[in-house]
Each structure stands twice: as structure tokens, then as C-alpha cells.
């Protein structure tokens, strides 16, 4: 009943826009399709992946694209790049290497509570750069709960500090690499960025935001850290078979090396910037060939819905550009923000992206907003359009205030140890701080 009602309302709104908004016909088609898809994505009336599959159907039916063009976005090279990321993550998880890395970092951090907690955040951040934010949080949550038990905190503020730190570390560090979070891939595809390009932007930004996040949580929550020393936090002896670990580690190192140095290597062998995706496919072949994992295991671990969401998002992005709908919406935003200066324009755009992400899928938010703000940047001429779109794409991963904002938030809230009002209080401050940091970095360095 709810699904039918939402589809009916979104359909009527889309028709209302098409018939009553003063604009060119192609632009009206783009706006109507965007409205229909955006409402379904934001409300999740249908599964996100299913709504993504509606995009090519609608754009072809409306006469905006032909079938081949519409469906070609579901074979975009960035989708194969992310598929390779899923394969690497599946292999690390199968051989317990992810748990080993997390445990090793935490044990090495030291026995003082603050060092152990910072080690927990650091391990979460490192894993989240290579594994999905959700999977990372699922891995680290039992470790965090074990640490809380060892510390005998008996303080809700301290528990919230530890648990929210894990969720927020996963969210933030996901922007560190191109495969760390789905919005990265959407943004990179729109801006033609490869793995190395993204690394030079995402990694420094994550390195700034993680300490800022810890500082905000400490300031807002005022945790009472016990002064007792902690015994060994994680048992890692025998966790990984040495022979398998070496094989997986070598393949992982080769793939990451090729990604980082993709520019000179691809030029040397005469392949364009999509070389990163070819490396990801090679990684899958090597992992299966050397029997570190079976294809069925990769298939089970892969979130195929996310890959379909990429295709729908990229098709929607292309449609917005071709119909002029993104330019139409950019003009509206410009009229409200451009008169207040470039900094306010960037800050307003970033905070809007963060706000939308609190209520909608971060991937869907990026798919909708990046092309609009790319057009806005081109229209204003006051700020590099790629920089504005990049800032908005990164901000799409930064919902900290609500349990529904990101899956890591929901997992932490599900423990029952963090009240929603605590998450809102800490998340609101962090949203503002992160928005300002992203804006400053984008303004001066992007």
C-alpha cells in the first residue's frame, strides 16, 4: 500500500513538473524523470537497485536516449573497478586477514585506554579504505564491544565515544580510496578521475577529518576514560594461515601498486585512464587462479545491488546533462547562493549534500547531486566546477547525525548502547565541522 501510494504521488508530481514548469521540453523530461527516481530512492519505496533499473526504461521511453546508450552505463569501467574491490575484500575476509590487521594495530597501539581506543579507530579507518564501510563496521563492532567490556567503563558517554568513533571512522576513511565508498566511484566517473587521482585528494582529506572527528566526539561527549591498563585486546595468533596470507598479500600489493602507479604504467603500455578497471579485473583473475578464493565466494560477497545502482546513477547523470535538467537546477541554486560569495556557495553546497545524505542513500545522493553541482560550477565561473562537484561527492558520504544516515550508524545504534539523541547531538556538530573542513580544503586546494 505504501509503495503504491509513493509511486502514485511521485508520478503525479513528475507529470505536474512536465506540464506546468516553464522550460524546454527536453529539460522538462529530465526534471520529471529526476523527480520520480529521486523520490523512489529517498523513500526506498522500491529497492534502490530496482529503482536504478527504472532509469534506462524511463529515459528510453521518454526519447531522451536510445537503448544502447542508456544501458551502456551499466558497463561503465568504474563498475568493474568496484567489482575488483569486492573481490579483494571477500578474499581478505575469507582468510581472516582483515581481522588480523585490525587486531595487530590495536595490540600495537598500547595498553593505555586512550591508545587502545585510538588504535581501534585507526584499524577501522585502514580497513574502510579497502572494504565497504558496512563490512568494516561489522568486523570492528565486536572488537569495540570487547574493548568496552575490558575497560569496564560504566559510562554511557565513554561507550558512545568508542562506538560512534568506530562508525564515523568507517564513514570518513571510506573517502580515502576510490573503492572505499560507492559515492567515490559515482563522483570519479563523472569527473574522469582514476585511482591515483582520487588517492591524492581523498587520503589527505581523510587524514584531516579523522583527528577532527575524534576531537569533536571528545569535546561533545566528554568521555570518562579509566586509568587502568588493558590486557591484550585481540587474539591474533593462528588467525591467518601463513601460506595463504602471503599469497593474498602479494596479489593485494601488486593490484594496489598498479593502481597507484597507473598513470606512468598505462602510458608506457599505451592504455588510457580506464587502466584501473583493467587492473581490478586482473586482480579477480589472479585471486581465483591462485586459489585464494572461488568465484562463487566472490559472487556471494559482492553487493550486486550497489553495482546496479552505479549503472542507474551514471545513466541518470548522463540524462541530466543531455536534457539540460542539471543546468536548469544549477541556475536555481546559483540564484540563491551565488550572491553571497564563492565560499558560501561551496559551503552551502557541501552542507546540503550532507543533509540529504542523512535521509537518503549516499550513493543515490551522489548520483543526483554531482552532475547538478558540476553544472553549477560551470555556470558561475567563480570556482572550478570539478572542485565543487568533488566536494559535493565527498560530502555525500558524511551523514553522522541519524541512524538511517549510513549503515555504520545503524549498526552502532543497533547495539542499544548509543541513544539517538546522543548521536544527533554529536553528529550535528560533526556535520558542521566536516562541512567546513571539506569547504576550506576544496576552496584552497582542489
Residue ranges and their predicted role:
Residues 1-81, 197, 201-331, 429-431, ...:
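Hydrophobic transmembrane alpha-helices of multi-pass small-molecule transporters
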Residues 36, 49-50, 54-153, 301-306, ...:
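Membrane-embedded alpha-helical segments and adjacent helix-loop junctions characteristic
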Residues 39-46, 123-132, 167-178, 260, ...:
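Transmembrane alpha-helix interface/packing and boundary motifs in multi-pass membrane proteins
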Residues 56, 102, 134-148, 163-164, ...:
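Re-entrant/interfacial helical elements at transmembrane boundaries that shape
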Residues 80, 84-85, 89, 119, ...:
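Alpha-helical transmembrane segments of multi-pass inner-membrane proteins
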Residues 91-97, 139-144, 215-226, 403-405:
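Membrane-water interface of transmembrane alpha-helices
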Residues 151-223, 234-235, 408-441:
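Membrane-core helix-loop-helix motifs of multi-pass transport proteins
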Residues 153, 199-204, 312-316, 326, ...:
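C-terminal transmembrane helix pair
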Amino acid at each position: 500500500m505504501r509503495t503504491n501510494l509513493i509511486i502514485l504521488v511521485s508520478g503525479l508530481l513528475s507529470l505536474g513538473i512536465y506540464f506546468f514548469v516553464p522550460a524546454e521540453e527536453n529539460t522538462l523530461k529530465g526534471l520529471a524523470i529526476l523527480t520520480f527516481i529521486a523520490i523512489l530512492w529517498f523513500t526506498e519505496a522500491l529497492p534502490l537497485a530496482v529503482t536504478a533499473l527504472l532509469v534506462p526504461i524511463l529515459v528510453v521511453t521518454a526519447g531522451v536516449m536510445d537503448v544502447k546508450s542508456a544501458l551502456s552505463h551499466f558497463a561503465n569501467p568504474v563498475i568493474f573497478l568496484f567489482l575488483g574491490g569486492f573481490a579483494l575484500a571477500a578474499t581478505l575476509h575469507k582468510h581472516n586477514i582483515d581481522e588480523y590487521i585490525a587486531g595487530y594495530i590495536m595490540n600495537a597501539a598500547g595498553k593505555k585506554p586512550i591508545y587502545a581506543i585510538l588504535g581501534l579507530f585507526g584499524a577501522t579507518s585502514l580497513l574502510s579504505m579497502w572494504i565497504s564501510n558496512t563490512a568494516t563496521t561489522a568486523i570492528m563492532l565486536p572488537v569495540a564491544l570487547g574493548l568496552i567490556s575490558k575497560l569496564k567503563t560504566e559510562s554511557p558517554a565513554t561507550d558512545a565515544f568508542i562506538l560512534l568513533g568506530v562508525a564515523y571512522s568507517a564513514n570518513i576513511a571510506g573517502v580515502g580510496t576510490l573503492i572505499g565508498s560507492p559515492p567515490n566511484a559515482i563522483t570519479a566517473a563523472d569527473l574522469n578521475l582514476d585511482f591515483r587521482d582520487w588517492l591524492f585528494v581523498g587520503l589527505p582529506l581523510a587524514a584531516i577529518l579523522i583527528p577532527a572527528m575524534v576531537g569533536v566526539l571528545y569535546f561533545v561527549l566528554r568521555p570518562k576514560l579509566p586509568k587502568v591498563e588493558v590486557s591484550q585486546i585481540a587474539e591474533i595468533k593462528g588467525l591467518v594461515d601463513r601460506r595463504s596470507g602471503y599469497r593474498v598479500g602479494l596479489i593485494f600489493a601488486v593490484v594496489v601498486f598498479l593502481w597507484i602507479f597507473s598513470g606512468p604504467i598505462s602510458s608506457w603500455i599505451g592504455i588510457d585512464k580506464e587502466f584501473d578497471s583493467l587492473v581490478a579485473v586482473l586482480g579477480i583473475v589472479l585471486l581465483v587462479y591462485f586459489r585464494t578464493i572461488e568465484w562463487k565466494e566472490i559472487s556471494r560477497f559482492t553487493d550486486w545491488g550497489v553495482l546496479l545502482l552505479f549503472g542507474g546513477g551514471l545513466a541518470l547523470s548522463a540524462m541530466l546533462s543531455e536534457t539540460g535538467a542539471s543546468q536548469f537546477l544549477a541556475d536555481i541554486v546559483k540564484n540563491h547562493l551565488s550572491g553571497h560569495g564563492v565560499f558560501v556557495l561551496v559551503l552551502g553546497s557541501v552542507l546540503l549534500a550532507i543533509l540529504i545524505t542523512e535521509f537518503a542513500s549516499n550513493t543515490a545522493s551522489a548520483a543526483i547531486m554531482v552532475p547538478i553541482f558540476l553544472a553549477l560550477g560551470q555556470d558561475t565561473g567563480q570556482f572550478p566546477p570539478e572542485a565543487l562537484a568533488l566536494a559535493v561527492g565527498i560530502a555525500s558520504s558524511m551523514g553522522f547525525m541519524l541512524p538511517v544516515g549510513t549503515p555504520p550508524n545503524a549498526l552502532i545504534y543497533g547495539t542499544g548502547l548509543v541513544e539517538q539523541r546522543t548521536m544527533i547531538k554529536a553528529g550535528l556538530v560533526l556535520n558542521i565541522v566536516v562541512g567546513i573542513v571539506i569547504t576550506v580544503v576544496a576552496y584552497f586546494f582542489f
